[in-house]
């Protein structure tokens, strides 16, 4: 997910996006724990997407 895509969303949409990413991260962590996750880089990508969304939420809150 690109930051430019996220910048076009408002705070409510970013909140929903964050919630879905956190659920996806939880699912991936459970798959990794049970050794069902073949592509472990997905976990890193989701973690970075979460960081992007949180950064944008902080920026929007400061304005």
Swiss-Prot record:
Organism from which the protein derives: Bordetella pertussis (strain Tohama I / ATCC BAA-589 / NCTC 13251)
UniProt GO BP: translation
One CC-aspect GO term: cytosolic large ribosomal subunit
Alphabetical UniProt keywords: Ribonucleoprotein, Ribosomal protein
Top-level taxonomic group: Bacteria
The keyword Ribonucleoprotein appears for this protein: yes
Any one GO molecular function term: structural constituent of ribosome
Gene3D superfamilies referenced in this protein's UniProt entry, alphabetically: 1.10.287.310
Family statement drawn from the similarity comment of this UniProt entry: Belongs to the universal ribosomal protein uL29 family.
InterPro entries: Ribosomal_protein_uL29, Ribosomal_uL29, Ribosomal_uL29_CS, Ribosomal_uL29_sf
Protein name as annotated: Large ribosomal subunit protein uL29
Keyword Ligase: no
Pfam (any one): Ribosomal_L29
């Amino acid at each position: 997910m690109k930051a430019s895509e996220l910048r076009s969303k408002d705070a409510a949409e970013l909140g929903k996006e964050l919630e879905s990413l956190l659920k996806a991260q939880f699912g991936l962590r459970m798959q990794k724990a049970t050794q069902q996750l073949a592509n472990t880089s997905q976990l890193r990508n989701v973690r970075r997407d979460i960081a992007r969304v949180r950064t944008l939420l902080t920026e929007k809150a400061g304005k």
